[in-house]
Regions:
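Non-transmembrane elongated oligomeric "stalk/shaft" segments that connect baseplates/barrels to distal
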Residues: 10, 15-16, 104-105, 123, ...
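Short glycine/acidic-rich loop motifs that flank beta-strands on beta-rich extracellular proteins
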Residues: 36-38, 52, 58-64, 83-94, ...
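Short, surface-exposed connector motifs at secondary-structure boundaries
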Residues: 20-24, 143-144, 165-166
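Acidic Gly/Asp/Thr-rich repetitive segments characteristic of extracellular carbohydrate-active
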Residues: 1-29, 34
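All-beta strand scaffolds that present successive hydrophobic residues in beta-strands
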Residues: 28, 46-49, 73-77, 100, ...
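Extracellular beta-strand-rich solenoid/capping regions of secreted or surface-exposed proteins
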Residues: 14, 21, 34-48, 55-104, ...
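Nucleic-acid-interacting cores, centered on viral/eukaryotic replication and modification enzymes
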Residues: 149-151, 157, 164
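Beta-propeller domains
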Residues: 160, 168-169
């Protein structure tokens, strides 16, 4: 299948992402997707599921990140499950997220998603893996990571977090080595630690 229409859809998210170009929106229909991971989204692409209750993405390698995002990416309306420490559902690439096209940085945007796992992390923002403001933007993300971490920001990375709800996490929101998180309209239920900060930036 060439992935250009619903009747000719790619069978995997990774397959669809492999042909995506800047400006592409990939529609993910309801179902459970076990994917070869990590899947790296090109800059300025969007991955949009039918609904977070009906689209579930699971990694074939549970200790590796599920998605790596670049400048201007968006992921919406899906549940991530099965990733375990040290993996995150969403992170910057292992190389670096460059400022494609120049100008101001447009952080990856994660909206209306759920991370449902054990020791894994929902979002890991490592400032050493991106440029400019080294940031991601989050709206409506539930983190049900039992014994894991909701959002981790390190190495002078930056997170704008709105409506992030953590349940049973060992650490809900954590910042290290100069990382910064702006947090609004969010809460931490159960779990061990709510807000954790340590270390200093360069």
């Amino acid at each position: 299948n060439n992935g250009t229409s619903i009747d000719n859809a790619k069978l995997t998210i990774a397959g669809a992402v492999s042909i995506a170009q800047s400006g592409t929106t990939i529609k993910v229909l309801s179902g459970n997707y076990v994917e070869s991971n990590p899947i790296e989204l090109p800059a300025f692409t969007a991955l949009v599921g039918d609904d977070l209750r009906t689209v579930k993405v699971l990694p074939s390698t549970t200790t590796s990140d599920i998605f790596h995002v670049n400048k201007g990416c968006k992921i919406a309306n899906m549940t991530f499950s099965g990733h375990v420490h040290p993996a995150a559902a969403v992170a910057f690439p292992t190389g670096i997220a460059t400022n494609v096209g120049g100008g101001k940085w447009k952080g990856p945007y994660i909206q209306n998603c759920t991370s449902d796992t054990t020791t894994g992390t929902g979002i890991f923002i490592d400032g050493d893996k991106a440029v400019k403001t080294k940031s991601m933007n989050v709206d409506a993300f539930t983190q049900y990571n039992q014994g894991g971490v909701g959002v981790a920001v390190t190495n002078e990375g930056y997170a704008q977090l709105v409506s992030v709800f953590t349940i049973c996490c060992n650490e809900a929101i954590t910042v290290h080595k100069g990382g910064q998180a702006d947090l609004a309209n969010s809460n931490c239920s159960f779990g061990t630690f709510g807000l954790v900060a340590d270390g200093v930036g360069d």
